[in-house]
Amino acid sequence: MPVFPFCRPMTCAGLAAALVAFSVGVQAQPAPADASAQIRYTRYGVPHIVAKDERGLGYGVGYAYAQDNLCLLANEVLTVSGERSRYFGAKGQTLEQRDNLASDLFFTWLNSPAAVDAFLQAQPASVQALLAGYASGYNRALVERRRQGLPAECGDGEWVRPISSQDLVKLTRRLLAEGGVGQFVEALAGAQPPTLARAQSSAGFASALARQERFAAERGSNAVAVGAQRSANGRGLLLANPHFPWMGGMRFYQMQLTIPGQLDVMGAALPGLPVVNIGFNQHLAWTHTVDTSKHFTLYRLQLDPKDPTRYVLDGKSLPMARQTIRVAVKGTDGSLSQIERQVYSSQFGPVVQWPGRLDWDAQAAYSVRDANLENSRVLQQWYQINRADSLAALKGSVEQLQGIPWVNTLAVDQGGRALYLNQSVVPYVDQQLLDTCSNPQAQGRLVVLDGSRSACQWKVDAQAAQPGIFPARLLPSLEREDFVQNSNDPAWMANPAQPLTGYSPLVSRNDQPLGMRGRFALQRLQGKARLGVDELQRMVTDEEVYLASLVLPDLLQWCKGASADVQAVCSSLAAWNGKADLDSGMGLVHFQNLFNALAEHPESWRVAFNPADPQHTPRGLAVEQAAVSRLVHQAALASLKQVSESGVAGAARWGQVQQALDGTPVPGGPQALGVYNAIYSVPHGQGKRLVVSGTSYLQLVSFTDKGPEARGLLAFSQSSEKASAHASDQTKAFAAKQLALIPFTEAQIKADPEYREVVISERDKGAVVSQP
């Protein structure tokens, strides 16, 4: 690495004094040195950022990110600050289709000044410097871009403002809450005692329920870590295929971070984070998949019959805590008013109210306790992973810090070891505590504990990183030299040769069917054949619909005796290639509709799920049974009606139906069908479906004698700004299955045909030095 080239001081107009104030840390300390960064861009606009220290590194990240996604981050900061209603009114909606008012009430509660400052104070100096630098870099870019004219995505720009370290903490806390209390936004914002309860929209809660059910589908992932015994060259090999939203606050950004002699890591990060979440360095490569572990529990409160805002604990009546939340709301005439709500809490957590599911009446109420609200270690955790020089160092860091919020970790090293960790922040509720304290009337997958007894509090272990969570020794861990894999299944079948069992149901279960993607992966990985990058890439790009291999022959057999009114469905199924590729026909659409209907009837399987044979059950469709035959016929008729109403042409190809926002055809399909390249799309106009989530940062890393070699892409491209040259370039490459070399070494970066360099420094007072 060459000596870092700092920019000479420039005599240009300085940043506004207000921006300087925003970049200062919360702790009293000497004024930090001016931040500097060198940003080298390669193909697709990917920044490779070099700095001498963390503040400079954060400065470069914030500046680069704001060149591509200024309005996206500004919008997310507005959301997590609880200020949407101030600018857009109470009835507008967030990207997640939440009413602004409910969102603002929730985030004003979640990100109180005390909670945000406590989180920031808990960070080590290195992380505080990264955050302060990021805010300063973003603010510099904001000044420059406002001078040039803000992107169209910023609208009138009234709501776009400088940011601070505290704003970045708010974004981080929102990410932490995604797997817990963040799924109860409306339920928390609307919770009121029965004597004060207002009429609540059932439609709003129906939307909230739909979002809960979509959580795993929109934030899934595939991962395969191959060790020396199975990799083609006897070294580590990793496939990272996270499935995340294509818009908003969970949209990945590709970048390389370098502090010479200390840090050199390449990968992708979520908005507002100055660290790499999924990536590789000289020694190892890692990725994450959303886990099936529970990260919160509910507590059923026994209320004092004299007062529904008091609850009984161990025979004593205790008052609920009350917190007044105030939100500014813009009226139709442009004037501002203030709305107040009370958030009630027990010692377990905030009270939530979900009509018909979690009712607050005279007898009972429900509190939610989210383990990740006490996780201030998450940024430090990823920064330590970024700097890890061995698989042992990565594993030791995850076990000690326990900062991973709600994902599994899979990794390989250059020596050919493969690692799987289901070690996130999970409430310490074992089977014994469940047997003693759980509510047998609890609905669905929610864990509801008895809130009338202190004995039902989460257990505390001195070796855990925080009170009330499982220590690492009680969480699944597996290290092998053949392979480990995960596609959002429990830890159980990470490698069938060594099943992981015996854990709390809140951690991992082994009594439920594997997902179709997991079964597909295990089928591809079975045997002893050596695996290379091409084999792992084809797992994604083959676009195979695994479920079709299990039931399509039965459907075609049924079609031989089907009535004339469903022959169009049968013809399309017979002509379908069994894939979710751009050229796949309407058979894919009808197959998906049929499966969605039959999924409600598990008795339709010819061979039911058998825990002793999870890789091969359930399978087959019992079409020979009259009841199943009727179900298939009804589903086929419904599919014809649905296709007709959606406006999809009978001869349409999948690439003409499923597209990105700019119209780029997108391959892939529903994860429930076993499509490894999982893509989640929604109806969007006549005969079209818009991709909103799915394959995001796709990374394949192999290790050689010279270090890591990587190929991949960012499926939705670097920039969320329509006018950017990098708004859809990688999306087109994704559609064409053209994964590119990911430049990592100095030679690879400088050899890139689109190489350009930018040098920025706080000393230069706003000037940018660009070198061709």
From Swiss-Prot:
The answer to whether UniProt assigns keyword Phosphoprotein to this entry is: no
EC number(s) of the enzyme?
Answer: 3.5.1.97
A single Gene Ontology CC annotation of this entry is:
periplasmic space
Catalytic EC class:
hydrolase
Q: Which InterPro entries match?
A: Ntn_hydrolases_N, Penicillin_amidase_A-knob, Penicillin_amidase_dom1, Penicillin_amidase_N_B-knob, S45
Compartments annotated for it: namely:
Periplasm
Alphabetically, which GO biological process terms does the record hold?
Answer: antibiotic biosynthetic process; quorum sensing
- Matching Gene3D superfamilies: 1.10.1400.10, 2.30.120.10, Glutamine Phosphoribosylpyrophosphate, subunit 1, domain 1, Penicillin Amidohydrolase, domain 1
* Top-level taxonomic group: Bacteria
Q: Name one GO molecular function term.
A: hydrolase activity, acting on carbon-nitrogen (but not peptide) bonds, in linear amides
Q: What else is known?
A: AHL-mediated signaling mediates quorum sensing in many species of Proteobacteria, regulating hundreds of genes, including many that code for extracellular virulence factors.
State what this protein does.
Catalyzes the deacylation of acyl-homoserine lactone (AHL or acyl-HSL), releasing homoserine lactone (HSL) and the corresponding fatty acid. Possesses a specificity for the degradation of long-chain acyl-HSLs (side chains of 11 to 14 carbons in length).
What is its quaternary makeup? Answer: Heterodimer of an alpha subunit and a beta subunit processed from the same precursor.
- What protein does this entry describe? Acyl-homoserine lactone acylase PvdQ
Native species of this protein? Answer: Pseudomonas putida (strain ATCC 47054 / DSM 6125 / CFBP 8728 / NCIMB 11950 / KT2440)
